[in-house]
Amino acid sequence: MSLPQRVLGPWEVSAMGLGCMPLSAMSANRLEILNDPEGAVAVIHSALDSGVTLLDTADIYAPSWDAFGHNERLVGAALATWSGSAEAKDKVVIATKGGITRGPKESWGRSSHLDYLLRAVEASALRLGVDRIKLWQHHRLDPSMVFEDQFENVLALLERGLIERIGVSNYSAKQLRRAIQMGGTPDQGGVISVQNQFSPRYRNDADVMDVCEEFGIAYLPWSPLGGISRAEGIGTGEFGAFAEVGATLGVSAYATAIAWLIQTSPTVIPIPGATKVSSVRDSLTGLSIALTDEQVSLLNSSLPEDAPLDGELEEQPAFR
């Protein structure tokens, strides 16, 4: 199936990717997926069959600390067993992330030290079943290190040939600009993606999107429907306009939210998660509709004025 395409560095990928984190039961209300590994693979296969060519994962996505890398293994196995041709498989970009640590008794931390990042990237490649990772993204900054020191370590992964392209995650606009100064733009072999939180609920990333548009960097909103625990709220209460607009178009509130995200910026590539084949198909319908200016205006005006902000990021301007 042919889907609309968007630019991700040197590649053209589907305008919507698949967030694979929920398939590793990172949320307590998703534990049933662990008892159905074939069903989890079927979700990924359904996305690939539908033309999705971007799969998002991370080394920490796992049901517990001692299953570290669970999601990467799942994604790697799903791509390997997919019925698509070798050419089709080669077009799929697996984007993974590293830089967050997870240990015994669920002790979480950060490390951007070079020795840790080198081990993390090598382990991710092994779990994914690849010689070199297509897109590796720095998951979160290490608060114990100076920005420049840790980003130099990120660039070292690229220089050593362990990864093809780099991206960043949970960076502010100021930090993104510094990363571009140090590593270059997409056409210079530098930063090609930013993965930050953005959805109808979280809308405080206008300045980051501006930087992405300026330099041709893809913006991959994580939790584009508001997160695992809040996605069901899209279409109800303060977000009821998404259901109203969707009803006039014959699609769900979720599909309407995907369409809204797509029209927010030409750099946006939503990566909604799913644990059911039906959810993948529903979200993909958002790529087949074009919201009118009036509908976009209605949706924007209906959103609550106060949008929550990731407390880790610097204060940012509201949604444009």
What are the language-model segments listed below?
Residues 1-92, 319-320:
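N-terminal binding-site loop/beta-alpha segment at the start of enzyme catalytic domains
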Residues 23-38, 104-115, 139-140, 144-145:
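Active-site mouth loops of central-metabolism enzymes
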Residues 52, 130-133, 163:
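A structural motif
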Residues 141-320:
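Beta/alpha (TIM)-barrel catalytic core signal, keyed to glycine-rich beta->alpha loops juxtaposed to Asp/Glu
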Residues 24-29, 61-65, 101-107, 228-231, ...:
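A short acidic, helix-capping loop that chelates divalent metal ions and anchors anionic groups
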Residues 49, 78-93, 125-129, 158, ...:
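Acidic (Asp/Glu)-rich catalytic clusters
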Residues 33-47, 112-127, 176-177:
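Short, acidic/polar
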Residues 125-143:
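Active-site groove signature of glycoside hydrolases
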